[in-house]
Amino acid sequence: LIYLLIGAILFGCQLNPSLSKSKLDIDRLSLIDEMIEKAIKKNKIPGAVALIAKDNEVVYKKAFGVKDPETGEKLKTDDIFRIASMTKAITSLGIIMLWEKAMIYSLDDPIDLYIPEFRTLKVLDNFNKKDSTYTSKPTNKKITIRNLLTHTSGMGYDEIGSSEIRAIIFKEKQKFMRNSVIAFSDEDVTIGEIVRRLAKLPLEFEPGVKWNYSNSIDVLGYLIEIVSGKTLDEFFKDEIFTPLGMNDTYFYLPEGKNSRLVKVQTKKEEKWVTFRHDRYNVNYPIEGAKKFYSGGAGLSSTAEDYFKFLSVFLNDGKYNDIQIIGKMTNKLLQLDQIAMITSDKHKGSHGLISTVVREEDLNKGNIGSAGTLHGGGYFNTKYFADPNEKVIGILLKQTRSISEHTSNKFNRLVFSSITQ
């Protein structure tokens, strides 16, 4: 009976037999189950899919909770999540691949060499809150590809960030779109049309002087289309998804996989309900024109697929003997690129792919080794990839308008399980 019970527990957790050899403490990892189940019981989250990989093998993969609040359908480990801003790392990798192949001359090239609409850049001077009118003045600097990769371009976002820039973008957007958030558009527009319009709007600050999370990776998605001669969707499939075997990652899901898309949930009167937004269609991965390839937030994926993507950065630029980028380039991606401009407002770091852990960050504890890449997405998805410990953690949820701490706890529990 004891052996049957142990077997049932291991099966339920989907623990890989290689876990015992992985230098991760099994007892400590079991605390992840306890933490997530407790969060579900206390109504903090409706569910999650968690994945942990060590030394190139998935050693833990488990689904918890409910996928659809209306039907009560349970989450499965191969369900598909809107990964939103986790798309950014994939788009940034695409830029690095083109740079490695000398299809982009330099990361310090001005973006206006490729997108002429950026030649007459202006920066915000004065803003009138009453009617969103503004004055602007010419910039002293040009936006470079590196600025775009590291969110130091001066651009903004239409859903988060500076209220002035949000208002300006929103006002411009109303001229050619319904009230939708750019990143999740289901309308009959292309990324090129959007970027060319954004290029004419004022920046929040001069390029290269501050960090500000922005639409800059959407600009880079359009740059990939210009340089490669392919749509961003085609480029991703040909150069990243097919080589890595990422068979469940899409801008728009094929009809046969629609049922695997997880519902976004929020709480209403302490009950989980399907989340809806008056400014965008939450079902954008399966509805609408299906023409808008947002390099900043448009992809949906699975935990397993994103593990394959992150594995590239833990293995000198390759996965399963498929070389995606060179070894030296991969080392470059682990370095902070914005140390010289870090301000009181933003004391963090950012590399060419994502946020990175620096030596001076290590005193915070349980955030990984120096060089660890980490990030997340708008619908409550998180990842990290530690190239020194060769450990990957992915926690996928689909929620909005709630506050909870399972992602931070997950990271801490994974790193504290490394005992050898």
Give the location of each predicted region:
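Short, surface-exposed beta-strand/loop micro-motifs that present aromatic residues
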Residues: 372, 379-389
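Bacterial Sec-dependent N-terminal signal peptides
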Residues: 1-23
